[in-house]
Design a protein with these regions (language model features):
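Short S/T/G/P-rich N-terminal loop/turn motif that feeds into the first structured element of a domain
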Residues: 4, 9-91, 115-122
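C-terminal structural segments of small proteins and small subunits
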Residues: 87-89, 96-112
Length: 122
């Protein structure tokens, strides 16, 4: 947006710079050891993710490990509007209550939240 400062008799152009929010991705790799208890963890998750703007992109579908150990057998990818919203969801009381079922021996999970976009220095 450009504006002219005519009150001071100057012709000055100013630009408003807006920061564009990048999405973030919560990636979970899981190994289920007790399916009944694990379901108590997964059942309440969709509305919790939605509350924080999360959108499940992949959950429990077909996969192929291309490289590395075959330790995990379930994969989930959730997109959030921002990194901060994804972290807030993970740290929320609602998620903590659900995760308690998994943490009590129903499965092993590796959770990672990563910013979208290419942040590699050039």
């Amino acid at each position: 947006m450009e504006s002219l400062n005519s009150a001071a008799g100057l012709c000055v152009k100013s630009r408003r710079v807006e920061e564009i929010a990048m999405p973030a991705y919560w990636v979970a790799r899981s190994r289920v050891t007790d399916p009944v208890e694990y379901k108590k963890y997964t059942d309440p998750l969709p509305p919790i993710f939605a509350k924080y703007g999360g959108n499940v992109l992949a959950r429990g579908g077909r996969f192929q490990i291309m490289e590395g150990p075959e330790k995990f057998g379930r994969f989930v990818v959730i997109e959030f509007p921002t990194f901060e919203q994804a972290v807030a969801c993970f740290n929320s009381p609602e998620y903590e209550a659900a995760a308690a079922f998994r943490r009590n021996g129903a499965g092993e999970v590796e959770n990672v939240i990563v910013d979208g976009g290419d942040a590699t220095p050039r």
